[in-house]
């Protein structure tokens, strides 16, 4: 969660979490991991994730029990309506 920060669109005031850190496959990943960032900036993301998990706990358990192939997409789009249906979510 430390790889994300909360940003606010200056025009719409919409708040979203944006990833700023490289992923393991990126060329700069090894250099980036040598750095240490101390920040409470990830706390809103952690709280948002915990809230979603609490709110959709039954749906999450049901999908896991069914061994759904597209668990992230089903949870994000169909069960919670938190995402657009065309999105591909691989990070859950």
Swiss-Prot record:
Record-linked InterPro entries: CNPY (IPR042415), DUF3456 (IPR021852)
Upper taxonomic lineage: Eukaryota, Metazoa, Chordata, Craniata, Vertebrata
Species for this entry: Homo sapiens (Human)
PANTHER family from the UniProt entry: CANOPY FGF SIGNALING REGULATOR 1, MIR-INTERACTING SAPOSIN-LIKE PROTEIN
Homology family: Belongs to the canopy family.
Pfam families assigned to the protein according to its UniProt record, in alphabetical order: DUF3456
Entry protein name: Protein canopy homolog 1
Taxonomy, superkingdom: Eukaryota
